[in-house]
Amino acid sequence: MDTGLDRSRAALIRLPLRYGLLLVPAVFLALFYFYPLVSILAVGLAPGGQPDLTGFAEIVTSAYYRHTLGFTLAQAALSTALTLLLALPGAYVFARYDFQAKSLLMALATLPFVLPTVVVAAAFSALVGPRGLVNEGLMSLLGLESPPVQLERTLAIILIVHVFYNYAVALRIIGSYWANQNPRMEEAARVLGAAGWRLPILRPALLAAGTLVFIFTFTSFGVVLILGGPRFATLEVEIYRQTANLLNLPMAAALSLVQIGLMLVMMAIYTRMQRRTAADVVSAASAVRPPRSRRARALVFGNLLFMAVMLFAPLLALVARSFTAGGEGFTTRYYELLFANVRGSVLFVPPMRAVGNSLVFALATTVLAVALGLITVYLLSQRGSRWANWLDPLFMLPLATSAVTLGFGYIIALDEPPLNLRASPVLIPLAHTLVAMPFVVRSVLPAKRSITPHLPEAARVLGASPWQVWRFIDLPLISRGLIVGAVFAFTVSMGEFGASLFIARPDTPTMPVVIFRLLGQPGAANYGQALAMSVLLMVVCAVGFILIERLRTVGMGEF
């Protein structure tokens, strides 16, 4: 018979286990997140071992760094305004109208957001670049000798790609909030004489979406680096240039600290705005209706046409150009070149080796992220735990830190004993795990918390061991969320670019790093190989995203 004494003994036995488990993700976070950030702080504030704020003073006094900071803020503000402006009609359509394939279109609209930046850069290069489909078509049609559409290395292409990336973010946040508002309030407002362009009810959602888009575009790296060229630099790009090109680590550290400070402010604003987007849910029948009028059908069709052109045309152009980049007609030559190590190539290994590297790193990342994520979920889901309230945001901190800052921290922190991992390929899956683990936690934690405590308690009363409770009760109930988290981890690792560009060795490059290097080299062969590898990476990410959407439980999970 189970007595209170027996339960007390069992609790005492589980206590060391719980704290022992806590040490595993805590040590991982301390070694591979906080230690690199503290190293950046030390280099930025005391580059020679003595307090020195010269780097910060130069940021304030130098016109170049003031311009870099100003451009970072300006392009983020412009990108945010354009994204909200273009996503608002689409959010209204998805919130108020019911039409065929609505769920599928929403899922497809989100696909660009999960694509690696190098793939998106290659896609827009294939569509509107000097050798893109648009310019080749216009040159052939009009008999021109030079490309008429000159968007490469302009602010316009940066803004367009930022809208491409973040359209789905605004569409989902504003659309879901709008769908939860009773349309009778709009009708009552019209009766009382309100104009159609007032948006007080949507203001929290607009501010939340705008803040999140601003954060994403403020930390833009791959888009500006690849498509903007040397003319443009965000803080992210400047940190990379100061480190990789100029070896000016104190200045890179100072810029990193400035960016971290600004990011903390923006994340605080976003968290506050997100809490204000809570709304009463109304029945779908009262808010959603078929587009019966001509005006409604035109609005739905116009938005779907815009989404097709804006979101899908670049991806289709990428696939088409990967077979026709050299102008000699349809060919699989560029896919075949991925298996060859061409003499004089910018790469040290055949490009296809990078596919194997990325797969190995992604598998290792998935195993590590799932293992650490499950331990974290177990700790955070303990009912009545006083630790959960502050451990939860602590383990999410890597999501609020840019990959470039993280990669820079690894360079200066992990290059000497006892953690001399700078030349080790192990560093890549460790960095990827740090970014991927929060996705596992957010995918599994809601499912674990939804398990009624009576189930495991009843199993223990009937004599089940902790392992049996986990194997036969917890695991089946969280399995869908666990698979979603694992696929997230795999996809995030495959497409990670910012940190990998810092820490990947020349003989073990990842797919995004190879694409970046090939895009930076002249010649049709390099360009064609970059497009071909981008297609392969896009397919992997698309398959992963489709699996996530199919396995995701409605209303369960936070991504």
Task: Locate each region found by the language model.
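Membrane-interfacial helix termini and adjacent extracytoplasmic/periplasmic loops
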Residues: 5-11, 53-58, 66, 101-102, ...
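Non-cytoplasmic
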Residues: 36, 170-173, 209-240, 317-321, ...
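N-terminal signal-anchor/first transmembrane alpha helix
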Residues: 2-39, 103-109, 260, 264-267, ...
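Interhelical loop and adjacent transmembrane-helix boundary motif
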Residues: 14-15, 58-64, 224-264, 293-296, ...
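Transmembrane alpha-helices
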Residues: 23-27, 81, 111, 115, ...
